[in-house]
UniProtKB/Swiss-Prot annotation:
Source taxon at top rank: Bacteria
Name of the featured protein: Transcription elongation factor GreA
One annotated GO molecular function: RNA polymerase binding
Family annotation (Pfam families): GreA_GreB, GreA_GreB_N
Recorded family membership: Belongs to the GreA/GreB family.
């Protein structure tokens, strides 16, 4: 049985669109590549055939992964997210306790929707794990590969 996957409606739709593309476009393209490579004769030393088979394997694995995630997905409605503590889909403003001038803002999302460029971090990341369950005023020590980071939760909200 798969772990429950928590997604926004947009995140769910993105995964669904990717699955549709893989099933109806990519899969057919890969099968064409395999057929073309087969037509070149001896498969034992056919790098084109090997590459196409590898692409097929990766495509089928991604299809299986997406089907599993979508079948176990729970779509979260931001309107029903509490802001008394840091939960998935909450945004949090942090004050850097080592440099009182620096503030950071993150939105906690599932690993399927994380995008550090947009400030969306996974609840499974070191930062996400450290923040889950914290309330405004709580101090947080986050252990990252570069060492320890010290923050205070200043604000919790939903975008």
């Amino acid at each position: 049985m798969s772990d429950r996957v928590y997604l926004t409606r947009d995140g769910y739709n993105r995964l669904k669109d990717e699955l549709h593309e893989l099933l109806h476009v990519t899969r057919a393209e890969v099968l064409e590549k395999i057929a073309e490579a087969r037509s070149h004769g001896d498969l034992s030393e056919n790098a084109e055939y090997d590459a196409a088979r590898e692409q097929q394997s990766q495509t089928e694995a991604r299809i299986a992964d997406l089907e599993s995630k979508l079948s176990s997905a729970t779509i979260l409605d931001p309107k029903h997210i509490k802001t008394d503590k840091v939960y998935i889909l909450t945004s949090v403003e942090l004050l850097n306790l080592d440099d009182k001038k620096e503030t950071l803002e993150y939105t906690l999302v599932s690993s399927e929707e994380s995008d550090s460029d947009l400030g969306k971090i996974s609840v499974r990341s070191p930062v996400g794990r450290a923040l889950i369950g914290k309330a405004v005023g709580d101090k947080v020590t986050i252990i990252v590969p570069k060492g320890e980071l010290h923050y205070e939760v200043k604000k919790i909200f939903v975008k």
